Amino acid sequence: MIISVDHGNKSIKTPNALFTSGLIVSEGLQGFKTDYICWNNKYYTLTEQRIAYLRDKTEDERFYVLTLFAIAKELERRKVPETLDPIDITLLVGLPPAHYEQLHSRFEQYFLRRREIVDFEYNGKYYSIRVSKVLSYPQAFAAAVTQFGTLKAHSVAYIIDIGGCTIDVLKLRSGHPDLAVVESFEKGVITLYNGIASKCNALYARILEDCDIDEVIRNQPTVLPGEVQQLIRTMTNDFLTEFYNFLRERGVDVSTSKCVFAGGGSLLLRGMIERGNKVAFPIFIEDIHANARGYELLYQSEVAANGQQ
């Protein structure tokens, strides 16, 4: 069985599921009606409080457990019955393009776990799985693959994947990667959230959550006072300006380039990017699951090329 998982610092995506990269661990069930997994005699529940940024997600077990949630949600979606007979899984994952060479082997082994059988309970159902193969792909390019039919018409374009803690930038020529520009800028929207929350607390003694900031950026109804809203908009514009300057220093001028934006951060910031009028030709990949679906397309292409089943 093929299962594709996009591990974001802000959220986990499969082709069919989306949830925050946050976990609570306990010795027993919490008593609240929420998704849970029991594995290795511990109970894990999902929370909207995301995990602090990890450049290397193999540092501890949390992203492994989040992957068990992703696998379980895909099994449930596909109506796979609970079973104690191991389900063999080929797991497709991704990494920021600039980190790929350094981290991909460790990342793959983290999930492979010597192909051991893993038994767990998910929301009262019992599953047994064995991750028999792990294949990793570059994020951003995977998202671009889902739009290859459109992108191949552009002689040069830049895919910009704005995530929780990284912004990945990849140059494309007729839809194919040009390794002359491969950047991972470690300043995604989580750093924006943290900066806004810190300054708002210092100036106005108000504690903000990510969702409070999202409401203002998206121009949604909010209970926040005007000065806080203005602070959020100003700091978000400064965040985008700093990023555009970062790109310009690396030879990418957003005022003259075709820029294809992907990722949840891009969808959050879309209105401000468009209203800012600094990006001449913005194209937005609106599917937040694009990377996960792109991993599947890349895998299918490899299988077809190798004549495998």
Name every feature range the model reports, one short phrase each:
Residues 1-157, 176-191, 211-309:
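Nucleotide/phosphate-binding catalytic cleft detector across ATP-hydrolyzing
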Residues 162-168:
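Ser/Thr-glycine-rich phosphate-binding loops at phosphate-binding pockets of nucleotides
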Residues 169-174:
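PRPP/pyrophosphate-binding module of the type I phosphoribosyltransferase fold
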Residues 200-203:
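Acidic, metal/cofactor-coordinating or nucleic-acid-engaging core segments within structured domains
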